[in-house]
Regions:
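Catalytic Walker B motif of ABC-type/P-loop ATPase nucleotide-binding domains
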Residues: 152-156
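Conserved ABC ATPase "signature" region
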Residues: 106-124
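Hydrophobic anchor residue at the start of the ABC signature
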Residues: 141-142
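Conserved ABC ATPase signature
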Residues: 127-135
Length: 209
């Protein structure tokens, strides 16, 4: 199977070098590295939020610098550590994020399926200002998933969750990604989650394993 994402000789800010990497559809890859190794910056390089000093990122065989940034960021979705939700209901947040990215919004059934995948146990009409930090994080992940990305970049997706909820969420997300051919790249400081769910790990301080 062809790689959906491939990096070559990437350098950021002329000082952070990254290993070459290939990721295939449906593959679950966890990234490792100490603080300061540039894990979050690596994700921003992969979806074109920032540009490398040197090297290339290929998405489906094309240099991402040749791809419309809005289109790229709908297909290579970055769910960062900060989960921002607009005022209003969960449903309204789905609609606003899709409007913001100039994307056709999902129907209610599709929204609910994404909420279920992210273990969100309440309705689309729930006001977001009543949610806890962990609940907001899961809604934010569900919205990101609703764009049906080809590549899902997950930066500490369970940071606001307790251990049991974190494991259940990762079980759902990894199953969803495998079943739908979504390549998932995950940064997590939780060693248990890495050992349990990673099909492969990449050390940003060295070579892939």
């Amino acid at each position: 199977m062809e790689a959906v994402l491939r990096t070559s000789s990437l350098v950021f800010l002329d000082r952070i070098s990254y290993p070459d990497m290939e990721v295939r559809p449906g593959e679950i890859v966890f990234l490792r590295g100490p603080s300061g190794s540039g894990k979050s910056s690596f994700f921003r390089l992969l979806n074109g939020t920032v540009s490398p000093s040197r090297g290339t990122v290929l998405y489906r065989g094309r240099d991402i610098l040749e791809i419309d940034p809005l289109l790229l960021r709908r297909e290579v979705i970055l769910a960062g550590q900060s989960a921002y939700l607009f005022p209003g209901t969960v449903r309204e947040n789905f609609l606003q994020y899709h409007q913001y990215r100039d994307s056709d919004p999902p129907d209610s059934e599709s929204m609910q399926a994404c909420l279920d995948a992210c273990r969100v146990p309440f309705s689309l009409d729930t006001p977001c200002d009543t949610l806890s930090g962990g609940e907001k994080q899961r809604v934010f992940l569900a919205i990101a998933l609703s764009f049906r990305p080809a590549v899902f970049l997950l930066d500490e997706p369970t940071s606001a969750l307790d251990g049991a909820t974190a494991e259940a969420l990762m079980a759902n997300l990894t199953e969803y990604c495998r079943n739908h051919g979504v390549a998932a790249l995950v940064v997590s400081h939780d060693r248990h989650l890495t050992e349990k769910f990673a099909e492969r790990t990449v050390d940003l301080g060295g070579a892939a394993s």
